[in-house]
Amino acid sequence: MSRFFAASDSSSEESSEEELYSDNEASAQEDSDKDSDDDDSDDDDSSSGSEAGGANRFLKDADSDSESEDEDQNKVLKSAKDKRFDELEATIRLIENAQRINDWAVISDQFDKLNRQAPTLMKQNDGKVPKLYIQAIADLETVVLETHEKQKVTPKKMNAVNTRGFNAVRQKVKKHNREFQKDIDLYRENKDEFMRETEEVEAAPKEKKKKSKIPQLGTEIVDEATDDGFITVGAGGKAVQYTPEGILKHLRAIVEQRGRKNSDKLEHIRTLEKLFDVSVNDYQRIRVLLTLISTRFDLTSGTASHMHQDQWKLADQEFGKLLEILENTKEIVVIENAEEWEDDDKLPPIEEGQIFRIPGSVVSFVERLDDELTRSLQHIDPHTAEYVERLTDEALLYAQLVRALIYVESLKKNASLELPQESLNRVVMRRLEHVYFKPSQVVTIMEANSWKAVPETLDSEVTPRAISNDTTSLVQTLSTYLFQNSEGIIRARAMLCQIYFLALHDQYYKARDMMLMSHLQETISNFDVNTQILFNRALVQVGLCAFRAGLVYESQNSLQEICGSNRQKELLAQGLQMQRYSQISPEQERLERQRQLPFHMHINLELLECVYLTCSMLLEIPLLAQLGSSPDLRKRVISKTYRRLLEYHERQIFTGPPENTRDHVMQASKALSAGEWKKAAEFINSIKIWELVADSEKIKEMLSAQIQEEGLRTYLFTYAPYYDTLAVSTLASMFELSERKVSAVVSKMISHEELAAALDQVNSAIIFRKGVELSRLQTLALSLSDKASGLIESNEKTLEQRTQGTANAFERQGGRGGRGGGRGRGGGRGGGVPRGGRNQQFTGGALGRAIQA
């Protein structure tokens, strides 16, 4: 408060206060004049410094009010350099206060003022940039980046003044900080080391400073360095000691500051690492590790989209240490439903034969490690060496999953702990989700490496060491355990994982029966989005398995729902496929990106499309040939997507050589419909994507056999009206099939009433029946009648829509109602005299407008 607004009414107090101010200002001005004789150009700065010095009197913390009387009695004269440093600190405090209330207009003004103060301080500091200034501009840049990222993720409306201020600060910081980038990088590498002044550590304090009533986080000030505990020299030459006796207090202070704004998480981590080094018993180590791992996970709560690899590996190592201590310390357990020890001054009494509970969750830690690894893989370019290097960390995570499962099993055995079954189910589910999509050889290697990291004395009851070499038994055991001990989403996901695994390993009939018996296709819409994605993946894998087994119809039927929608990427969570008229909010887009699967879990979409189009070709070409003689089949469409592509291809005047998968399939379709099965087989087998499939030569042989058979069917559908009899041997030589195979195909067509013929087995010939197939004239007549009936229905619907609501068009108020209610057009008894002054003619109503139209 200014002296002109003193609260006292006494004139004597006012006069004495004015004298005190004048004395202070005079002495400060004299000192400023003495110290700045060689710097005449800074007169304005010195005057502003004296004014700021007066203002700084009222910027002191609240805890210094009780000591104001002592300070007034012991005034210390400050040099111009100290005053300018005080001004710098005051400006930085104003910037920090404005950051707390998100006032970017004030930050912009104070940042300009800060930059004006820096050159003067650099001159007085022998050209060195003040470290306090570097700290301020580096922290401000971090806040600007965090705010900008938050605006991207969750846009929050700023007012116009704030928006202008934020944009101005952003541009200024970006441009200005380039000059000090080297110092900023040094500061960010190690903040404590950068801010530590060696001169201050060696020199004795020149003036007596007040003691803060608020102790610093996790530190104890000692006069001399001792051999007990961990001692660090902090800013100002003060020794900071960490002792075993103060560990619980430090942990309490760190936990209380978690989640607060502007808390230094890296400083907390360094403190916790030192506390772990000085801990002397297992209880302290467990408590420190629980807090340390949680604090590492807090690093990703800011602008970082995923946890850095170094931090992740440190968290993984600390989680391994935690499990090792818990495995060797049977009297201490970490469990979620435990009560926290409140007394920070002494350790809890842990007696032999009793179990002491510490609140925490091993399951949550391993789940968070899994989530952070997945999020990291989502953000790394999959075509770089960095992705492959990061993928190797999955082996470390899988080993931790196995150890966590063994530990949770040991807790489950003790009935007094009352561990919920859900905790064990979550670990088993995570382990199953890491093996269901991998080939057996990869899973076997992962299992072997994981069990090497587990002590020989430990074993799992759910998945013993004995079955680690048998991947099929492992997946079966994990799935069966979840079937028996879980329900809802976890049970459904376990079933889908097993279906996927069976289909991946060419066990089609088991996977199909399990899919049908689960009835998930009826209830999958009630599950969450991630489970629906897993259902789509399992369905697609079943379709691919059917294709590898040569079951074309079953494969096309399984892939139809996914591949026929043109949304394969979205349905399989392998990317965003923006539709032309779709409107998706930024929040929805962010959620969609979070659901994306890492690249190594993707199903090859090009292979998927190739399989779908090939199966559709083998089914649609014979059907299209059959339509010419069977009008009842005209409305039957197996694949609309394939029909649309085929029609587009046929409309092209000139078709060049095939370039991609679709071109190969379309030209093969054209050749197959013309009876050139060899050419069709060449087009299909020349598709390069088949090389990515296991046993590609076997797949190509299967496709050639399928094309031969469907080519035979297409030929018979097309040319049956032109034959009376046809020798089986002729067809066998034409399509390079055995006579037995030709007879089997023809018999099947006759039994399904697809072909009006009889098979003469004595003469080995096909006898076609005449009069059953429609002639060309009859086909055209039926087509004309169908079009005429469709035109009539369309006209009737149009008339009905236009005359809708005209049932009361002729009713008049006071009339007899109905069409015959009045005499003539005017209605009423008064002849043609209009009523109410309105001449409403026949053509004026809704029906009249319809007739006019």
Curated annotation (Swiss-Prot):
Entry GO CC: eukaryotic 43S preinitiation complex; eukaryotic 48S preinitiation complex; eukaryotic translation initiation factor 3 complex; eukaryotic translation initiation factor 3 complex, eIF3e; eukaryotic translation initiation factor 3 complex, eIF3m
InterPro entries tied to this protein: EIF3C, EIF3C_N_dom, PCI_dom, WH-like_DNA-bd_sf, WH_DNA-bd_sf
SMART domains cross-referenced by the UniProt entry: PINT (SM00088)
Cellular compartment(s): Cytoplasm
Stored PANTHER family: EUKARYOTIC TRANSLATION INITATION FACTOR 3, SUBUNIT 8 EIF3S8 -RELATED (PTHR13937), EUKARYOTIC TRANSLATION INITIATION FACTOR 3 SUBUNIT C-RELATED (PTHR13937:SF0)
Gene name of the encoded protein: NIP1
Keyword Protein biosynthesis: yes
The protein's name: Eukaryotic translation initiation factor 3 subunit C
UniProt keyword list: Cytoplasm, Initiation factor, Protein biosynthesis
Species, as recorded: Phaeosphaeria nodorum (strain SN15 / ATCC MYA-4574 / FGSC 10173)
Domain (PCI): residue spans on this chain: 599-773
GO molecular function: RNA binding; translation initiation factor activity; translation initiation factor binding
Keyword Cytoplasm among record annotations: yes
Source taxonomy: Eukaryota, Fungi, Dikarya, Ascomycota, Pezizomycotina
Biased composition (Acidic residues): 11-46
Biological processes annotated in GO: formation of cytoplasmic translation initiation complex; translational initiation
Family membership: Belongs to the eIF-3 subunit C family.
Function text: Component of the eukaryotic translation initiation factor 3 (eIF-3) complex, which is involved in protein synthesis of a specialized repertoire of mRNAs and, together with other initiation factors, stimulates binding of mRNA and methionyl-tRNAi to the 40S ribosome. The eIF-3 complex specifically targets and initiates translation of a subset of mRNAs involved in cell proliferation.
Gene3D superfamilies documented for this protein: Winged helix-like DNA-binding domain superfamily/Winged helix DNA-binding domain
UniProt biased composition (Gly residues): 815-835
Complexes and interactors: Component of the eukaryotic translation initiation factor 3 (eIF-3) complex.
Annotated segments matching region Disordered: 1-78, 798-853
